[in-house]
Amino acid sequence: MKKLVSLLLTLCLLLSLASFAAADVPADWQPFAERVKITVPVYDRSKVGYPPVDDNYWTRWIQENFGEKYNIDVQYVAIPRGDVMTKYSMLIAAQETPTILMEYDYPKVAQWANDGAMTEINLDEFKAVAPTFYQAMVDNKQLGYTDINGKTYFVLTERPYYDTTFTYATFVRMDWLRKVGYDHVPANYAETVDAMNKIIEAGLTTQPLGLGIPTSAYITNFGFRDFPVDEKEWAMHSSLGTPGFPWYPTQRMLKRTNAEYHMGWYSKEFDLEKDSRGAATDQTQTDFINGLTYSYGGYIANNMPWLNAFYENNPDAELAIANPWGGLEEGVNTGAIRADNPFGMIVGFSSLATPDQLKAAWMLMEWMIQPENLFVLENGIEGETYKLGEDGLPVMLEYEGEHMLNHNNNIDMTCLVHASKKVGTVEQTIAQMSPAGLPQDFTQMLIDNYYILRDIADKGLAYSDPVFAVAIESESEYSATLLSLYQEYYAKLVKCDPAEFDGLFEQFSQEFLDAGYQEIMDERLEAYEAGNTTKLPVAE
C-alpha cells in the first residue's frame, strides 16, 4: 500500500510539473536564425573531488537540452568564490564581461552598474520573455530592488526561508563537551567560556577554536549591536561590501575576541592564516579535520567532504550543532543574527550584450525555473544520484561518477533561479539536504537548529543590511583599501595587551575614517535621509 501511495504521489508530481512547464514556457520561442553565444558565471570553490565547474556533465546537459534547441551556445565562466571582484574586474577590463553578471551582495552589483559594466533593462520586455521568472519576483515582493539611481538594472532570484540562515551550521565536538561535564551544547556565553576553558584544562586540545584573518568585508557584529539598533547607524555602517569598523559593536566583538585570545583559545600565529568561514579550504578547516579544534562551520549539503574527512581522522568522535544562542551575554551580545536578504542572486546583464544575447540569457533563466528542468539539475539521475522516498520526494545518494552533481546539488548553477533547494515543507527540505553517508544523522539536529533560528527571527533579532537605490560611489573607491586596513587592525587588536585595547581601537578608528570611511558614512547617511534605502523591519 505504501509503495502504491508513493507511486501515485510521484506520478502526480511529475504530471503537475509537465503541465506547469507546458503552460508557462512562452509558446512563441523559436531558435535564433544565427548562433547566439552567452556566457554565464559560476562559482569555483576549488573543492577536491568535484568536476570542473565550467565544463561537466551538467553544463553539457544544459547545452544539449536548452542551447541546441534554441541555437544558443551556453558557456560557463569560472569565478573564484574567494576572489569574486578581482575576476570580474579582469573580465570587464578585457571586454569579456559575462552576458550575465550576478552576485549575492548588493554593493558589488551596484558597483558594476555604476561603472557602466551593466546595461539598463526593460522589465516589460523581460516579462515577455520570462513570464514565470517575472511572476516569481512579484510573488516574492522583489520588484522594489530592481532599480538603482532611478534606472532598472536587475532581476532577482528567490531565497527560501531567508531570515533563518539554516543552510549554514557550525559543528562542535560533543564528545569533548561530555568529557568536561556537559550533556548539551553551550546555550549562552557563560557556558561557552566555561566549556572552552575546561576543554583546555582537560588537555583535550591546546587551542580549541580556529581563527584567521577575515577574507571578506562582512563583520559578524550583529549580536553585539544594541537592540533595537539605531536605524541611522545601521544605514551608515551595516554592510557586506565595506567593513563597519569604527562602530561600537565591532569594538565589543573584537574586545571579546581579544579576551578569548588571552585565555588561550586561539593559536598565537592565527594572523598567518585566513578565515574564509566555510567558503573555501583554509587552515581553520584543516585543524578541525585533524581533530585539533572544537568547532567548524559550513553550508549544509548531502556531500560535505570536510565532514567525511573529519570522521575518517576521528572515527570515534561525536559531533553536534552549535546553539545559535551560544554567544548571548547581557550587555554585550543580544543573540541577534544577520538575516539573508529577501532575495538570492541579484542578476544583471552586460552592457556589451547584443539584444539577441539579452533575450537568450532571459530564455535560459525562464527555462531553468521550469520545475521539471530545475528538478533534474538539482537531483540528477534517478537510481544514480537520487532515489524517491516513500513520500515521493527525492533522497540524495552518495555518487561520484560522471553524473555527479557539483557543490550543494549544483547550487552554483541553479542560483540563477533560487539561493537554496526547496522541497516540500521546511522539515522535508532539511531532511533532503542533510549530510549523507556519515556515522551520525544530523537531520533532527538541523531541524531543531532551524526552529531556534526561527525563534530568533520571530523575536525581531534577525535582520539584514540596508539596500540602497543609489550607488554609493565612495564604496567603489575605498572598499578595497579599507578591507586591507581592517585585516591589519584585526590582528593587532586581537593580540594586543587588553589594557591597550580601547586606546588602539580609538586610534585605528580615526585612521579608518581618514582613509575614506567618513566619506562612505556621509554618502550612505545622505542616501538614507533622502529615502533611497530600505528600512529596518517593523516588529509585529
Positions of predicted regions on the chain:
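Bacterial N-terminal signal peptides
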Residues: L8-S16
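Positively charged n-region of N-terminal signal peptides that target proteins for export
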Residues: M1-L9
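Extracytoplasmic/secretory soluble proteins
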Residues: L13, A21-E540
